UniProtKB/Swiss-Prot annotation:
Compositionally biased spans, kind Polar residues: 11-26, 631-648, 734-753
UniProt keyword Lipoprotein, yes or no: no
Main localisation: nucleus
Post-translational modification: Phosphorylated in response to DNA damage.
Family classification: Belongs to the SLX4 family.
Keyword ATP-binding among UniProt keywords: no
Name under which the protein is recorded: Structure-specific endonuclease subunit slx4
GO cellular component, one term: Slx1-Slx4 complex
Biological role stated in the UniProt entry: Regulatory subunit of the slx1-slx4 structure-specific endonuclease that resolves DNA secondary structures generated during DNA repair and recombination. Has endonuclease activity towards branched DNA substrates, introducing single-strand cuts in duplex DNA close to junctions with ss-DNA.
Name of the gene this protein is made from: slx4
Cell compartment(s), UniProt: Nucleus
Keyword line: DNA damage, DNA recombination, DNA repair, Nucleus, Phosphoprotein
Pfam families for the chain: Slx4 (PF09494)
Length: 936
């Protein structure tokens, strides 16, 4: 037997007693008796059994003090004694005595076991005090076993927080105090123990049933020992913060909970096999063990009990996780192993055998301790022969609201695939039809009874009825017939064709027919559209266009006038100067002419009764000037509507009317005296004429006078332009004009005194009268449709131009409605002017063409400029530079035209016409704002 290698570890046991320390210079020598009792150190051994060199050998000579220190810490004799005790220990439990344990520093939690229950406790890694040895207290030496017969103790580091260990020794006597971690074999039952986080010691009972309180000092975590052969595996137990005492019955064996840590292995001669205990998980204090469940689980077997114990330590899973229940019972295992994938995903019909298996599973779940849900009512299923297919429950479709169909839907409805009624019958019956709800009902093809109520609530609905007007299934056509059908189709574009009504499928056809009918209407029947021939016929009179615009509301579908009530304009407050005021309702023949006929006012006046005829008034200066111009014209009308005999009395009548003008003026309405009116009366009179309020009294009186004169002014007489005046000389006409002008002078001056400054001499009045004549001619030009060249007969005088003084508009009196000429007078004037000579127009055109030729010659014949920055006018035109009209006119008038033989001057306006005729870019020197242009 070889000598085992010994390693010495000093482990502090109980707190050392406080002893008085003496500070001496040299250590005291031991007594003589102690030195005699010490045995001699054995001789050194050779071979494998030789002792190894100690960890702290002395390098110098050994002195008495060194020997004393070695003796105080432990001599070789004590090592040999401990080793001999460890190797010669016999596993005899009856001879062992209880080992005295040091008392814990805190209050102990005792646990008592009764009866034959044997208890195995974890032994802390420490050396008990040997009662037979006489040595000083303070340190306990731990011995590590070596070889097969020794005790092997693994050192462990001290944790940060020390824990108290429970130590229960199963040996009867404690004589083997020097043994560390010894476990008594032949343990048949195991008790469940819990360990607190606080360092507490528990009381344990050995086989004899005697319990002795043990003191567990606060020390580091201890190692767990293995049980000997024949004993059951013992699991580790994790310390719980709050310890609870457990009691077990005599016939049960409960697995103890061991703390986590390293395994301490022991080897004995009688137990060569080693059993390693598994680790246990942490037990939550919220799970309280149910004794009834533990009793049921204990009968099932060790495997089930371990599984249920393990499930207590699980963290509760999340709600979205699928829990799979594994039945560990033999009954559940036998029934679960026969289940296949097809049975799990089978049809919705169940048989009675499957219902019984479900009941067995529920009962087995209750017996195995699973959570029992609330009681549910089992539904008996009818066994069917439908093959097992994974059917899906059809959802109830909501009724689609009827909405307007678009053209796209109508066009593509012929090609959409429609479901037939046969497809519904081929589908399997729904799940609700398997239930035997009612005995009466319809029989389907599959042999199921469909109750009436379930039929109404069934999710499967029939096909909707075909909508009215939907396209039928198309027939495949040949290419030729398809082309013909496409040619017959009518495509309508626009916003009105985006939606088609469901109740009228022929909407597109009707709409297209209506459009074609509207396009086929005769343009000549449309009153708003005039044919080219009619436009050419009516181009001579402006009144034709006015009639077509303003009288269109009173015409029927054929363009004829509607017989409506004629409004009498005699007593209206607002004057109508463009119509002859009628004293009474005229005849229908005069008011409703034919469609293409035109009645002259002169003829109507002759045919009217004498009571309704308008008295002939004196001709004004404008009419006299026009007649004078026409009388001096050499050309005579080719076709005169009346002969000389009929015209002579008219001339006499006109001559007499000029003389009788003065007495007839007194017959007009008398103007009221507005000076005598009060201010409120003047305001009311102004409101009658639709004017705003005026604060000044004088302005109100002047305005009322002007309004009265404009309203009560007699209608203008008919022009006598068509009748040439031969018997009347130019002197007589001039005298008449002079007399009429002298008669008009006081009226003009009196009307101007209200607002403008009074005229100083007759020359100014004559110039104003001439300007008025010119303005009236301009009005005639704008109102008639004759070309402007027929009105303007300017004579270019080479001596110079006579500047005509323009009278500003502010000098003229402001009237509420300026006097207008009647339509018939405008027509007569236009006819008279058309008959005027055209000789002057030809002369002007020839003169203008000659001027343009001289302008062209003057520009092109000018020598080219030597300065590139200042080119000539011809070069500017060729370079497309804009030509300033004022500059070019000044250059031409300063000698350029004289060089080419033209004595006169050219105006910028005439020069602009020449530039436009030659397509030359030209512009004015002044811009639109009135200032000179900075750049061109």
């Amino acid at each position: 037997m070889t000598m085992a290698t010994t390693d010495v570890f000093i482990i502090s046991s109980s707190p050392p007693r406080q002893s008085v320390s003496y500070n001496v210079s040299s250590p005291p020598l031991p007594s003589l008796d102690e030195m005699i009792k010490q045995k001699k150190a054995p001789n050194l051994r050779r071979g494998g059994g030789a002792a190894s060199t100690p960890l702290d050998p002395t390098a110098t000579f050994t002195s008495a003090s060194a020997l004393l220190r070695r003796g105080s810490s432990g001599s070789l004799q004590e090592f040999d004694t401990a080793r001999s005790l460890a190797t010669t220990t016999k596993p005899d439990e009856n001879e062992q005595k209880k080992t005295a344990k040091p008392k814990a520093p805190r209050k102990p939690a005792a646990k008592k076991e009764d009866g034959p229950i044997e208890k195995v406790a974890k032994v802390p890694r420490k050396t008990t005090r040997n009662k037979g040895e006489d040595r000083a207290e303070g340190f306990i030496e731990g011995v590590v076993e070596e070889g097969k017969e020794g005790v092997k103790t693994i050192p462990e580091k001290k944790p940060r927080k020390s824990r108290a260990k429970k130590t229960d020794n199963l040996g009867g006597d404690g004589e083997d105090g020097g043994i560390t971690g010894a476990v008594v074999p032949d343990v048949s039952k195991v008790a469940v123990e819990t360990k607190a986080c606080k360092p507490r010691a528990k009381k344990g009972d050995d086989i004899t049933g005697e319990g002795v309180k043990e003191r567990a000092p606060r020390k580091p975590r201890a190692k767990k020992t293995d049980v000997e052969a024949g004993s059951e595996s013992v699991a580790k137990e994790k310390a719980v913060r709050k310890p609870r005492a457990k009691k077990s019955d005599g016939g049960t064996t409960v697995q103890p909970k061991m703390a986590k840590g390293r395994v301490t292995k022991t080897t004995n001669a009688s137990n060569p096999d080693k059993v390693e205990t598994p680790k246990a998980d942490k037990v939550s204090k919220h799970f309280a063990s149910n004794p009834v469940v533990e009793d049921l689980l204990a009968e099932e077997g060790s495997g089930l009990s371990e599984a249920v114990k393990r499930r207590k330590n699980w963290t509760p899973p999340k709600s979205n996780q699928v829990l799979i229940d594994y039945d560990d019972s033999p009954e559940a295992g036998s029934s679960g192993c026969n289940q296949g994938f097809t049975e799990l995903l089978g049809s919705f019909g169940f048989s009675s055998s499957e219902a019984n298996s479900i009941e067995k599973r529920i009962s087995s779940g209750v017996s195995s301790g699973a959570a029992v849900t609330r009681k549910r009512k089992l539904i008996e299923m009818v066994h069917t022969n439908i093959p097992t297919t994974a059917g899906t429950k059809a959802t109830k479709e909501k009724a689609v609201k009827k909405k307007a169909r678009t053209l796209t839907d109508l066009a593509t409805s012929a090609y959409t695939a429609t479901e037939d009624d046969d497809t519904i019958n081929d589908t399997p019956a729904p799940l609700l039809q398997h239930f035997p709800k009612a005995a009466s009902g319809e029989l389907t093809n599959d042999g199921f009874k469909k109750p009436p109520k379930l039929r109404s609530k069934s999710p499967v609905k029939g096909l909707p009825k075909s909508k009215k007007g939907s396209a039928e299934e198309p027939i495949l056509l040949s290419p030729e017939s398809a082309l013909k059908q496409v040619g017959n189709q009518d495509f309508v574009f626009g916003t009105s064709s985006q939606l088609a009504r469901e109740d009228s499928p022929s909407l597109l056809r009707d709409l297209h027919d209506a459009m074609q009918a509207s396009n086929e209407l005769d343009d000549y029947d449309d009153p708003f559209i005039s044919p080219p021939t009619k436009i050419a016929e009516r181009a001579k009179a402006v009144i034709a266009a006015k009639r077509n615009l303003w009288s269109i509301a009173a015409r029927d579908d054929h363009g004829d006038l509607i017989d409506i009530e004629t409004v009498d304009l005699a007593h209206t407050p607002v004057a109508k100067p463009d119509r002859i005021i009628l004293s009474q309702k005229p005849s229908s023949l005069w008011i409703t002419p034919a469609k293409d006929e035109w009645y002259d006012i002169d003829e109507i006046e002759e045919n009217r009764p004498p009571s309704t005829q308008v008295p002939v008034r004196q001709m004004g200066p404008i009419e006299m000037a026009i007649n004078l111009e026409l009388s001096n014209s050499p050309l005579q009308p080719k076709n005169s509507s009346k002969d000389v005999s009929t015209s002579s009395p008219r001339k006499k009548h006109t001559k007499a009317s000029i003389i009788e003008t003065t007495p007839k003026k007194t017959t007009t309405a008398k103007m009221p005296d507005y000076e005598s009116f009060t201010t409120p009366q003047l305001s009311r009179e102004i409101q009658k004429y639709k004017f705003k309020q005026i604060k000044s009294r004088k302005k109100m009186i002047d305005l009322l006078v002007q309004c009265f004169e404009s309203q009560n002014r007699p209608a203008l007489g008919v022009l006598q332009g068509n009748i040439p005046i031969t018997s009347q000389g130019s002197s007589e006409v001039s005298k008449v004009i002079a007399g009429s002008s002298t008669q008009l002078e006081p009226t003009i001056s009196s009307s101007q005194r209200g607002r403008g400054r009074p005229t100083k001499d007759t020359a100014a009045s004559k110039s104003k009268a001439k300007s008025k004549i010119k303005d009236s001619v301009a009005i005639l030009e704008t109102d008639s449709n004759a070309p402007l060249s027929e009105f303007r007969t300017p004579k270019k005088s080479k001596k110079g131009k006579q500047v005509i003084e323009d009278v500003p508009d502010s000098d003229h009196p402001m009237t509420p409605s300026p006097p207008r000429r009647s339509a018939s007078q405008i027509r007569k004037a236009s006819k008279a002017l058309e008959l005027s000579p055209i000789k002057n127009d030809h002369d002007d055109e020839a003169q203008q063409a000659q001027l343009f030729t001289h302008i062209y010659t003057a520009i092109t014949s000018a020598p080219p400029s030597q300065d590139l920055s200042n080119p000539s006018w011809h070069e500017k035109i060729l370079l497309y530079d804009p030509v300033v009209l004022e500059d070019l006119a000044s250059w031409l008038n300063t000698g350029a035209l004289g060089k080419v033989g033209w004595d006169g001057e050219v105006a910028p306006k005439e020069l602009k016409k020449w530039c436009e005729s030659k397509s030359i870019c030209c512009l004015w020197k002044e811009n639109q704002g009135g200032g000179a242009r900075s750049r061109y």
